[in-house]
Amino acid sequence: MKTSIEAVSFRDMEQDCEFRFQKDYPFWHLYTDGHKADIIFSDNEDFKSGMNLLGVCCLRSPEVKVYTFVLMNNHLHMILSGASSKVIGLFDMFRLMLQRHFARSGRVVNLKDFKCQLIRIDSLQSLRNEIVYVNRNGFIVRPDCTPFSYPWGAGASFFNPCSKLRPSVTYDSL
């Protein structure tokens, strides 16, 4: 029995990835149109609130798996798996929580055009490409950031070499 990653061939790892892809299918790229929406997250406090609210929504949607995401000042991107109705439900909950948060803080934010679109991801290669696309968004828009440093998404977990030193955990195990 092979016990270390070095002993597993590339072909075996690819077969394992393909098996996991099929097991968790369907996958989705959820996004909102940044060309239509007004600014939502105007400062670090807004982004922190958005990150926390998105985390709460993910925890309240156990039937949806979130693989990566990025919050931008007027839109978001997420890669998820689960039934499309559950994925849309997670987004709708996030949008409602944002509305309530801003109403409590007295800030007027127009979320009329903050609507989600779904793109089905039908292959493992497409999933990989979409994950890279989502994680690149932050530092493409903000040249002062790198894949390691954009704070409002999961990109740092993908690109940070230090993340390999941390044990793999899920939110449920924390």
Regions found by a protein language model. Name each.
Residues 1-73, 81-174:
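Short Pro-Cys-Gly-centered "Cys-loop" motif that presents a nucleophilic cysteine in a tight turn
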